[in-house]
Amino acid sequence: MELQSQPPKLVEEERSVPSLPRLSGVHPILYAFYGPDGRLDRAALERQVDACLGAGCHGIALLGLVTEVFRLSTEERLDLVGWAAARIAGRVPLMATVAEVSVHGQLDFITEAKRRGADWVVLQPPPVKGVPEREILRFLGEVADRSPLPVGVQNNPLNMEVSVSSDALLALHRNHPNIRFMKAEGPAVSVAGFAREASRTCDIFAGHGGIEWPTNLRSGCQGLIPAPELVDAQVEIWRLWSSGETERAEALHRAVLPIIAFMSRALPLLVAYGKRLMAMRMGLETVHARLPEPGVTSFGIEEIGRFAALLGPLHAEPGAALSPALKRLAGLG
């Protein structure tokens, strides 16, 4: 891990950075689908993009844990960026997570991701155990300062081996103004103080599938980066909440909460079953695994089929409304 910059100071430094629109709303992070030969399936990726755009998403993300990033080669990751950018065609911003473990590796990846159409990049604490927090901040700060794209930082203590404190994230943002958003994952009560403090100058996104989506909104978050299988419901929750219809937003959240809970027990289960639910809702008949994959059970597939019937299909047409099945489920009529 390359650590060449000075340690961050807990004071704000004035730097000139380009102004950008604030990010908000629902930015689903796509699954990686494979063909029977184990190679990436571009058509399935494009179908996901279409479904998310049809649901009215505000952006699209790639290459996080949901995308099985550590199963992909660097070239495969960049292929996904290029394919997604071509399909999105500038309609919403595209953010790509950076998985390389050196400063130069990350900067090389960011440069190429920008060339292929990414608008933002997301950095994570490098997966190197035993490194002092200050050194992790130096690493992230150097990449952010030299990145040709605006940067977000994901901190996920529940699903990542290395994470940093909320105070460290605040210092990182103060000292490196190219860091424009944070994905702060964890129980809403744990991140609320951070979200309210940071959201004055930084866009704060929740995660964990949106399991606390309305609570996250109350706590100061401006957006959500979930897996895509509930994108229509979660975009509608955002729309209702933003228009002041908070009770209807809460009702819709309660309707899909059992499905989110089913997916949230463990990351391998989300990848195995969430991907299959997304496939069912998009009309894909077969999901091919890239081995090794956690085994799916017949009962699990039955449950996913039941969820798909409750939710109804995802439509690719722009401005597609919630399915009648999902409206009935939420009592929205």
Language model regions located:
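Surface-exposed charge patches
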Residues: 50, 111, 214, 239, ...
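Residue-level signal for alpha-helical context at structural boundaries
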Residues: 63, 95, 102, 161, ...
